[in-house]
Amino acid sequence: MKSSVAHMKSSGHNRRETHSSYRRSSSPEDRYTEQERSPRDRGYSDYSRSDYERSRRGYSYDDSMESRSRDREKRRERERDADHRKRSRKSPSPDRSPARGGGQSSPQEEPTWKKKKDELDPLLTRTGGAYIPPAKLRMMQEQITDKSSLAYQRMSWEALKKSINGLINKVNISNISIIIQELLQENIVRGRGLLSRSVLQAQSASPIFTHVYAALVAIINSKFPQIGELILKRLILNFRKGYRRNDKQLCLTASKFVAHLINQNVAHEVLCLEMLTLLLERPTDDSVEVAIGFLKECGLKLTQVSPRGINAIFERLRNILHESEIDKRVQYMIEVMFAVRKDGFKDHPVILEGLDLVEEDDQFTHMLPLEDDYNPEDVLNVFKMDPNFMENEEKYKAIKKEILDEGDSDSNTDQGAGSSEDEEEEDEEEEGEDEEGGQKVTIHDKTEINLVSFRRTIYLAIQSSLDFEECAHKLLKMEFAESQTKELCNMILDCCAQQRTYEKFFGLLAGRFCMLKKEYMESFESIFKEQYDTIHRLETNKLRNVAKMFAHLLYTDSLPWSVLECIKLSEETTTSSSRIFVKIFFQELCEYMGLPKLNARLKDETLQPFFEGLLPRDNPRNTRFAINFFTSIGLGGLTDELREHLKNTPKVIVAQKPEAEQKKPALTSSSSESSSASDSSDSESDSSESSSESSSDASDSSSSSSTQSSTSGITAHSAKGTRKKRQGKARGEEVDKLARGHQALERRREGGREDQRHQEGRTERARSERRRAQNSRDADWRDPLAKHIDDRSHENSHSRVGNGREQGSHREPEDRHGEPKKRRERRDSFSENEKQRSRNQDSDNVRRKDRSKSRERSRRHSGHKGDDARCQNSAERRWEKPGRRPEQSRESKRSQDRRREKSPTTQK
């Protein structure tokens, strides 16, 4: 046992010595080769672990010691082999001693090696050269005078690469505009390969900033489309490479970048649909996950530009969810994707705020399919000497000036470099002129970003307040500009309109602001007029809330009642929306104030000029419309005065006629008299002519006498009229001008009534002519029909002797029972004489009365000469009709008596 322990100690001591010598002699290259050993060579730790486990399992101590000694021997052999390999591989190192290197080198070989080392160019090494301090770099640049030389181009290439990498790594949302300006200062046309590589590397390293890099690429693409195309080509190739290699991370980063480029309109949406189709064609867990991540980023954009395409994609996802055997986690991801689509991608907007920096006209969209062969142009990543280096640099400077408008900055730098004092003064004058011109320029913010933020602030303050007093206090503490006063009032009204039902909170808040300052009250007045003019644009719910809010403001006298001046109630000036607004408005006022108080307010004499449109009195049609409107909405009590006004309108018109007639001279009255007299005479002559056709010679003489008397009256009146006409011609012309307007209005109003009168006159004439023709035919008949006609004539006559008519009517039945003929003839002759006298007297009285009435009417209604004359003519004819019938019956009686006398019965 002791010998074995001594052997173990000696072997352990030898091992430590060899190990320490190995550690001392190992260089970094030796360690590198040691790391590259196979796992079999590094397996001694595993062997020791197995030995330990064996000892724990109960193996004998001797067996364990033997196994350990065998392991140590094997380890020593491996170490010897490794040392032998290292010595054979090592090349002679110059900084080693000759003893350590194993060979002796002469001192003459050392300076030749140093010369070779000095001749090596650091820029040609794999890493691009070691770090050069700035002072030494400036020194080297000063030594190079030829800018077209290879060394200068290489140095400028290295500087370009460093600046592009630094700017890309610094970009974010807040400084993207500054980074773009600095980036355009560099020659990105020459370094487009470097720029593409830097952008793709930065995006793959930090995918969370993909939207920022996409906005950067969109801006560069608007100025240099070939750079955007190169980046998109490399992205497509990266995606295809990751898809072939089943590299999910590469596919995720590439697809996310492509999605944001589609949102920025750099890539076409067809590329997106092709990528989704490829990913979902043979679905796996990874491909579905990549497709869902891709769809979340550009789903809203696809919904806008290609709804049919995105519907097909979601239909495919639904089939995968129901049919394919995929992991539970992926199934949940698909369900979440459908929920995101249902919410409208609200957490995944197309372009984030602050990154929409390219105008639509400047955007350039690349149509690059997924399956085409593209050249990544990796040569652009490596330095290559340009024979036209200076010319290309000058061209890019011109492009840079055009993009950045650097003419002014270049002139300022030239002045600072050293120019004459005269040139400085001229430049200062030009700058002063530019400043003066700049003061005149007004910039209009079409995006209205400030307005949107202001409205958002007001909305949040309103929604976070418990009562209107707290809200008013918050809004007043904001201290906004006076120009935004109306916008504040508009926002209060909009918030009120957006509510599902009217809340008194907004009415109290608006009333508080109106009480605080006159400017708020004036703003709400103008808003009321604008809202009423554009009320047809609001929905019914919003319209109701707006009407109730303004009703509250008028009830509390926060707004003056003069705002109702803009309401014009008529059939032409109102729409369905405006009538609904007025209805809700006045019903709400009636609930607040009560009908008596509201009626008293509307009858206020000081406010009547403002209520002329609301309660119109200018036109009976509008008045009737207003009455019907307020009655239909249950507020008929407000229209009592309007109803009285509508009833009194004809009386007022009649009362205004004498006043107009008094102003007229005697000319108009005389002319009206003559016209009325002539009309009456015409009517009489017509009646006499009609009677002469059906009567005998006696009736012809009476009608001719009446005609002569009427014509004599006509000539007398016409003579008087001509004399008065000559006297008052000068005065009549002036009054006629004043009366014409009034006459035209009255004629229009009474046109309908006169038409009815004319129609009645025509029907009456037709009836009289029928009766005349019937009487003329009935004259040849015997006793029964003659008696019946005689009875009718007695009933219709207007005589003072009524007993004779009664006797005649009572005698008819006696004649039927056989009364003697002689008595009947005597009674008939007596009654006929009495009837004749009474008829003549009645006709004379009627004619006198008609003439007096016609004169009075002509004086009162001078403006209606022709119309009144027609009415009088028809009236005279009505009065004359009873007179005609007795005359006709009288003639028929006489003819009957003659026949009886000539008959043989009477002779006997």
UniProtKB/Swiss-Prot annotation:
Keywords: mRNA processing, mRNA splicing, Nucleus, Phosphoprotein, Spliceosome
Domain MI as annotated: residue spans: 453-569
Subcellular location: Nucleus; Nucleus speckle
Signal peptide span: none
GO biological process, alphabetically ordered: mRNA splicing, via spliceosome
Ranges of biased composition (kind: Basic residues): 720-729, 848-863
Segments traversing the membrane: none
Quaternary assembly: Component of the pre-catalytic spliceosome B and the catalytic spliceosome C complexes. Component of the minor spliceosome, which splices U12-type introns. Interacts with EIF4A3 and PRPF19 in an RNA-independent manner. Direct interaction with EIF4A3 is mediated by the MIF4G domain. Full interaction with EIF4A3 occurs only when EIF4A3 is not part of the EJC and prevents EIF4A3 binding to RNA.
Modified residues (Phosphoserine): S38, S60, S106, S829
Record protein name field: Pre-mRNA-splicing factor CWC22 homolog
GO molecular-function terms, A-Z: RNA binding
Sequence segments annotated as region (Disordered): 1-127, 403-442, 652-908
Summary of the function given for this chain in its UniProt record: Required for pre-mRNA splicing as component of the spliceosome. As a component of the minor spliceosome, involved in the splicing of U12-type introns in pre-mRNAs. Promotes exon-junction complex (EJC) assembly. Hinders EIF4A3 from non-specifically binding RNA and escorts it to the splicing machinery to promote EJC assembly on mature mRNAs. Through its role in EJC assembly, required for nonsense-mediated mRNA decay.
Bias-annotated ranges (Acidic residues): 420-436
Entry GO terms, CC: nuclear speck; nucleus; spliceosomal complex; U2-type catalytic step 1 spliceosome; U2-type catalytic step 2 spliceosome; U2-type precatalytic spliceosome
Residues covered by the MIF4G domain: 161-344
Annotated Pfam families: MA3, MIF4G
PROSITE patterns with a match to the protein in the record: MI
